[in-house]
C-alpha cells in the first residue's frame, strides 16, 4: 500500500506523458484539459486520480488493513488478539477526528463508477489500433486490468447495501426481483472483495508501467492479431 502511494505520487509529479498510441494510462482516465494557470510540474491526473484513491483509502477492507498494519488497532478480531489490544475497551471511540471522513466512502463510489465507464472506453480503444480491430499484449493487459477494477468496484460493500441491503421485503418494492438477483450476484463478488482489492491494485501498476515502458521505447507492443 505504501509502495502504491509512492508510485502514484511520483506519477503525478514526474511523468508529463500518459498516452502511447491508443493506450491511455489508467491513472489519467478520463483525460481532462490542463489549465494554463496551473504550475507545469503538475499533471492532469490531479483532477482525476483523487477519486479512485479516495475510494480505496475509505474502502472497508483497506481501512481494516491499514488500521491493523499501521496502528495495530485492533490487531485482529480473535479473543486473544483483543486481549493484546493496546487500549482499554472503554476508551474506544470509533472513527473520529480525521478518520470520520471515511464515512464519505459511498460518494467516492459514485465517482469511481463514472471513472470505471471511461476505463472500459479506454480498453475498447486499446483493441482499435488505427481504427481497426486488433489484439496485442497491451490490449490484453488493459482488459485484465479493467476487469479486475470492475470486480473490485462492484464487490464494494456500499454498492451491495445500496442495491438491496436495506430492503426487508423484495416483493414489496418496485423492481424487487431484479434487485434481489443483483444483490445476490454482488454478494458473490463481495465474498472475494479483499482479493479483488489487491489484484486490481497490482493490475493498475502493471498497466501503467507497461505504458511507461512503451513511451520510453524500452519495449515494443507485441501484436497478436
Model segments located where?
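Membrane-embedded alpha-helical bundles that constitute the cytochrome b-like, heme-associated redox core
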Residues: 1-225
Amino acid at each position: 500500500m505504501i509502495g502504491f502511494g509512492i508510485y502514484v505520487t511520483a506519477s503525478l509529479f514526474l511523468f508529463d506523458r500518459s498516452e502511447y498510441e491508443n493506450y491511455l494510462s489508467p491513472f489519467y482516465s478520463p483525460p481532462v484539459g490542463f489549465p494554463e494557470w496551473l504550475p507545469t510540474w503538475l499533471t492532469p491526473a490531479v483532477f482525476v486520480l483523487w477519486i479512485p484513491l479516495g475510494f480505496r483509502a475509505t474502502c472497508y477492507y483497506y481501512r481494516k488493513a491499514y488500521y491493523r498494519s499501521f496502528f495495530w488497532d485492533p490487531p485482529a478480531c480473535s479473543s486473544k488478539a483483543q486481549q493484546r489490544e493496546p487500549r482499554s475497551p472503554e476508551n474506544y471511540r470509533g472513527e473520529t477526528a480525521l478518520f470520520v471522513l471515511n464515512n464519505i466512502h459511498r460518494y467516492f463510489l459514485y465517482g469511481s463508477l463514472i471513472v470505471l465507464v471511461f476505463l472500459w472506453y479506454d480498453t475498447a480503444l486499446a483493441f482499435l489500433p488505427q481504427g481497426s480491430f486488433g489484439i496485442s499484449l497491451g490490449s490484453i493487459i488493459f482488459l485484465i486490468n479493467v476487469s479486475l477494477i470492475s470486480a473490485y468496484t462492484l464487490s464494494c460493500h456500499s454498492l451491495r447495501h445500496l442495491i438491496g441491503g436495506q430492503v426487508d421485503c423484495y416483493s414489496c418494492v418496485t423492481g424487487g426481483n431484479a434487485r434481489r438477483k443483483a444483490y445476490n450476484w454482488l454478494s458473490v463478488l463481495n465474498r472475494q472483495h479483499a482479493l479483488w482489492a489487491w489484484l486490481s491494485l497490482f493490475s493498475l501498476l502493471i498497466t501503467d508501467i507497461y505504458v511507461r515502458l512503451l513511451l520510453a521505447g524500452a519495449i515494443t507492443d507485441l501484436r497478436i492479431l
